[in-house]
């Protein structure tokens, strides 16, 4: 362990940690309105301020004269304001024209719908502008460029950071404040052991913080970002693993053994496990039979890849060992579906099972409780109802959680507490890139199933604009005439709903601050229900959404499964748990509002039987600007059916939280890590976290305690989950 960690001087560590925890009000230049503005940005301490990194930079080390600036490229030009003119070429269209001059020529700059710029600038001001250079009417021009007023003594030849700011703090003041904070912590203690810094060739913490805010070159900025990204990843990995291990202190892992139940179950399966399924089960079996450690495994599988069959094999191993297992699903529909599909296979393998949900009658519930306590039941399928205090197992040794991102850590731990030392298998059908899985689910070992064991009929996807709506309705009518069914998916429940109602929609589009962005119009289930009943006379159309009582939801889904409903208008509540092989058409309204991974999940609800499915994604994109980009993104759905490929595309375009659903990863925001580009760095952090905890359990040694303190400070909300706070 001495190679990994050296013991820091306590006085040095204490002084520097105190400096980072200092309130921003103690900093030079911070008082009154500036303090309020910083707090609005979530900046309360010196540490918060130093982690509030620039979102872009103005690189004046590569500035051009007006004459030499190449047309058609993005350039930085430093010049002087010569003239400011405001125009209004048409109603509600305001243009501020600024003429910039240097010794080589004139640059005409136009700012659209930004009238306040005329008040910010005056003749003689020295400006740096960065934008695409165009040529028209005899002059070089820029439209709405990024600009910086050079009023703080900085000249061309430097790199200026551009931070997110709030009213009351200008960019110039933010730079002064950050510079003052860096002086306060001029040599901050580095919690990452020196051995790791050398091994990974990392910049020191002090230099990285200075270089990320005030780099001497963009190359230096990149090296600083890499250091801070590694630190962020390592801290997150450690926080997740410490949280996970927090409830496992002093437990004795159970060593399972495979036997007759497993052999009988494999015989009962209607197909042989694919190579990928066998590999995943081999991982699980190795974990379950290892009496030296408790299993913590994530099973990732695209829609229809056969995760349930793999999980059923794990249930059989638990039964072979004379112990019990519990499968918890997020909805009653999904729990019942598990019981309906997996239960008969378990029965054929000689295993007993039961289903427990909130709708289970009292008498049946009491019988299940008694059978669990006596050990008569091998497997319990259920919802949150299994977390009830009166549910007790004789010997619970395996916990399986499906769509685990829909459960909180507390719920996961509450179920696991019913069987101290129980192995944990969590599953999700949301394709997640490996880098994201390592970062956000770093406390879990991962097995991946990418391909379907038995190729299905497949799904054809088309992106349609509003002008092609008749094609969508025609597809629904055609399916009905063939005796098939359809889904219509809307982002909202009621027409009166606002953006707030979209907060938990997986993959919903957001701005840089995480706020839902809403176009007009947004489709809702109530309006769409009425519209479809008018457009498709003779068809039975009903709706489904998450606000309905559980019993009503079950009634609608059961009716749809029985074929009594021809068209189901629904929110994304059907994304998980509705398996109707006769449903062959899906129409998704406002497709541009969803991430690719979420759309892929939705279309996985059709084409599940012997008949191929059709998914029609409706969009209001007009084909220009950002709308064109949205349409290009959607068209990638037409080209690939691989959920992991789509998830990787999503990762390049959207925040990590939008792939998982904004709150599903516990409020963790990755500031520095580029999940698309930092695969090696993320792998390093993962390996180093495992090694650190192997040598220093809980990081509670003298040498590693500073690192634990730093992790606890950065991810204090995760550590609260350890202590139940």
Positions of predicted regions on the chain:
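Upstream accessory/linker segments immediately N-terminal to the RecA-like ATPase cores of bacterial MutS
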Residues: 34, 71, 87-268, 662
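OB-fold nucleic-acid-binding modules
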Residues: 52-82
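Long, highly charged, low-complexity intrinsically disordered interaction regions
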Residues: 1-28, 36, 236, 246
């Amino acid at each position: 362990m001495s190679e990994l960690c050296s013991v820091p001087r306590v006085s040095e560590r204490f002084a520097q940690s105190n400096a980072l925890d200092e309130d921003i009000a103690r900093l030079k230049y911070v008082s009154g309105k500036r303090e309020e503005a910083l707090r609005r940005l979530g900046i309360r301490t010196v540490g918060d301020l130093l982690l509030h990194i620039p979102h872009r930079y103005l690189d004046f080390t590569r500035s051009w004269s007006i004459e030499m600036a190449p047309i058609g490229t993005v350039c930085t030009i430093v010049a002087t304001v010569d003239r400011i003119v405001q125009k209004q070429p048409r109603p509600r269209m305001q243009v501020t024209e600024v003429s910039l001059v240097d010794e080589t020529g004139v640059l005409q700059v136009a700012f659209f719908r930004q009238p306040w710029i005329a008040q910010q600038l005056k003749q003689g001001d020295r400006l740096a502008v960065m934008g695409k250079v165009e040529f028209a009417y005899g002059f070089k021009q820029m439209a709405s460029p990024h600009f910086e007023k050079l009023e703080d003594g900085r000249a061309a030849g430097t790199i200026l950071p551009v931070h997110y700011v709030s009213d009351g703090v200008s960019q110039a003041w933010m730079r002064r404040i950050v510079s003052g904070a860096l002086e306060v912590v001029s040599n901050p203690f580095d919690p990452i052991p020196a051995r790791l810094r050398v091994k990974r060739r990392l910049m020191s913490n002090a230099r990285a913080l200075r270089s990320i805010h005030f780099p001497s070159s963009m190359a230096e900025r990149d090296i600083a970002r890499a250091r801070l990204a590694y630190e962020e990843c390592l801290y997150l990995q450690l926080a997740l693993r410490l949280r996970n291990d927090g409830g496992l202190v002093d437990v004795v892992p159970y060593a399972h053994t495979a036997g007759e139940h497993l052999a009988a179950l494999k015989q009962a399966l209607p197909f042989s496990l694919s190579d990928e399924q066998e590999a995943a089960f081999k991982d699980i079996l190795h974990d379950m039979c290892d009496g030296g450690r408790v299993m913590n495994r994530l099973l990732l599988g695209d829609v229809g890849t056969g995760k349930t069959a793999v999980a059923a094999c794990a249930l059989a191993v638990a039964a072979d060992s004379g112990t019990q297992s519990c499968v918890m699903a997020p909805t009653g529909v999904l729990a019942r579906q598990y019981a309906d599909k997996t239960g008969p296979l378990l029965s054929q393998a000689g295993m007993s099972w039961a289903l427990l949900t909130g709708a289970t009658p009292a008498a049946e519930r009491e019988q299940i409780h008694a059978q669990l306590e006596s050990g008569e039941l091998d497997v319990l399928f259920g919802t949150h109802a299994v977390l009830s205090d009166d549910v007790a197992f004789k010997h619970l040794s395996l916990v399986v959680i499906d769509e685990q991102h829909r459960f909180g850590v507390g719920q996961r731990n509450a179920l696991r507490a019913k069987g101290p030392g129980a192995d944990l298998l969590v599953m999700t059908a949301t394709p997640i890139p490996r880098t994201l899985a390592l970062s956000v689910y770093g406390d879990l070992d991962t097995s991946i199933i990418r391909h379907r064991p038995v190729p299905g009929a497949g799904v054809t996807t088309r992106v349609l604009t509003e002008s092609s709506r008749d094609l969508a309705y025609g597809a629904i009518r055609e399916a009905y005439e063939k005796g098939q069914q359809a889904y219509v998916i809307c982002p909202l429940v009621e027409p009166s709903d606002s953006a707030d109602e979209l907060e938990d929609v997986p993959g919903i589009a957001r701005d840089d601050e995480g706020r839902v962005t809403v176009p007009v119009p947004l489709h809702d289930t109530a309006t769409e229900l009425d519209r479809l009943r008018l457009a498709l006379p003779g068809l039975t159309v009903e709706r489904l959404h998450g606000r309905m009582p559980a019993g009503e939801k079950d009634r609608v889904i059961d009716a749809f499964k029985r074929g009594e409903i021809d068209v189901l208008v629904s929110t994304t509540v059907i994304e998980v748990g509705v398996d109707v092989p006769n449903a062959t058409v899906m129409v998704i309204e406002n497709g541009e509002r969803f991430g690719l991974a979420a759309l892929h999940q939705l279309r996985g609800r059709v084409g599940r039987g012997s008949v191929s499915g059709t998914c029609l994604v409706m969009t209001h994109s007009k084909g220009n600007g950002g709308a064109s980009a949205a349409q290009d993104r959607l068209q990638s759905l037409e080209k690939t059916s691989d959920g992991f490929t789509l998830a990787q595309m999503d990762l390049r375009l959207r925040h990590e939280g939008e792939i998982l659903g904004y709150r599903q990863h516990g409020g963790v925001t990755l500031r520095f890590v580029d999940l698309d580009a930092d695969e090696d760095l993320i792998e390093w952090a993962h390996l180093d976290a495992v090694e650190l905890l192997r040598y220093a359990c809980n990081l509670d040694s003298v040498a590693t305690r500073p690192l634990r303190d730093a992790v606890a400070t950065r991810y204090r909300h995760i550590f609260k989950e350890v202590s139940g706070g």
